[in-house]
Amino acid sequence: MYKRQVTADYFHKKTKDLIVSGIKASTVVGNSFSPVNAGNITNKGFELELGWQDRIGDFAYGVRANVATLKNKVTKMHESLSSIDGATYVTYGAITRFEVGKPAWYFYGYDFMGVDSKTGEPIFRDIDGVEGITDNDKTEIGKGIADYTYGITLNAAWKGFDFILFGTGSQGNDVFCGLNRVDYNLNQLTYFTKNRWTESNRNGKTPASGATDYTKYLTSSGCVFDGSYFKIKQIQLGYSFPKQLIKKVAIENLRIYGSLEDFFTFTDYPGFDPEVTGVGNSLGVDKGSYPNSKKVVLGLSVTF
């Protein structure tokens, strides 16, 4: 006997009067930024879930999959503000921004166009048309919010054996990689060094280590990567001993199992883990936080 399930939902949520730090207070109180009801956000999208359970003799199996889309947009801000800077990267300035018409806390920086093959200097898009690259040339360079997320679960059982595979993923989100600080010599990614411009590698994709505008590169699209991924969160295989066997030793249920957790990740992101932990105005910002650990789990479940 099979069982199937289909669930579909549409959501359109409007959030009003978000509280953020945005207005600079008087110098009398330290000239810090005071909290303010800065604006409104809309989130809308679809959620779809499909499920299938069936049995063929002693073999039972099931498949469950889900996908959710999300479109996020800032629709209104406090009248005294045109935008609000968010997460910062060391002393190089803000890398996220809150602004009407954009996704909440989108990545904000210079548009990196490549490396000058003669000098190793980074090249940026000149947006304001004025000679020289300044803060006025910063623009939207990515977003930490995924276009859609998805998951899949496979399960099966046969004569005491049971198996489950669970995976999740996201698509359309970016990650700002903050692991290439020139003032810090730990945990840097090989991507930046292997692709760096040198006299013997004039086609390098990242600027020379002594480039004049290197700090601008660190807040540019050159440090923004596709954060899409699919991760197998768990693979578990177990075996439950026959009751007629274990009841002889006064055991009601006995199950042994082994699992691999967070063991397999499929992504083009060069950092430690595309599933970064940044939240709020740091969504999608990777500053080197500890990645999810790969785990091998062996277990025994006993019921007397």
Predicted features by range, described:
Residues 170-261:
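Extracytoplasmic gating/loop element in the C-terminal half of outer-membrane beta-barrel translocons
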Residues 8, 50, 63-65, 165, ...:
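Membrane-embedded beta-strand positions of outer-membrane beta-barrel proteins
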Residues 7, 18-22, 62, 69-87, ...:
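Outer-membrane beta-barrel and related beta-rich outer-membrane complex signature
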Residues 20, 53-144, 268:
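Conserved small-residue
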Residues 35-43, 87-119, 194-196, 217, ...:
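C-terminal beta-signal and terminal closure region of outer-membrane beta-barrel proteins
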Residues 44-50, 148-154, 161, 232-237, ...:
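Hydrophobic, lipid-facing positions within transmembrane beta-strands of outer-membrane proteins
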Residues 1-2:
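Conserved small/polar residues in nucleotide/adenosyl-binding loops
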Residues 10-16, 52-54, 67-73, 158-160, ...:
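Transmembrane beta-strands of outer-membrane beta-barrel pores
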